[in-house]
Amino acid sequence: GLDLVLIDYLQLLDMRSDNRSYGREAEVSQTSRAIKVLSKELGIPVILLSQINRNCESRESKIPILADLRESGAIEQDADTVMFIHREEYYDSNAEKGLGLLSVAKQRDGRTGKIAFRYNEPLTQISDARDSSQKGSKDNINSQKENVPF
């Protein structure tokens, strides 16, 4: 049987019926809810990727927050867990290369927080930021982490 569903990405799904016309936000909300129902009916997790809006680009901290989910508050409401991936070097060319942050913004049955990681872009490989064999020091990484949930 099916153990997991991965959907890349929510805003590409079209759930409109032939005889109804929805606004974009209502359509995304309907799709989000339908996927939540599907997950419950099948008894399997669904990993649903979604775009974020550009609001974070106007803030000092570029780390995405729940309000940045694009086109629907229903995504935040329907999801059991919401995580964002942030790479400071995307916004700041002087930032340390290869360092990322996984922000657990919502976790229905657990704690939220941020987890630092390293990534190797040419290999599309992610590794533990605390691994001292990677570029950078543990002290630098620890200064990047807050409230690690795991």
Put a short name on every predicted segment:
Residues G1-L2, N19, R33-G43, R54-F150:
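C-terminal regions of RecA-like/P-loop NTPase motor modules
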Residues L2-L48:
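Helical hairpin unit composed of two closely spaced alpha helices linked by a short loop
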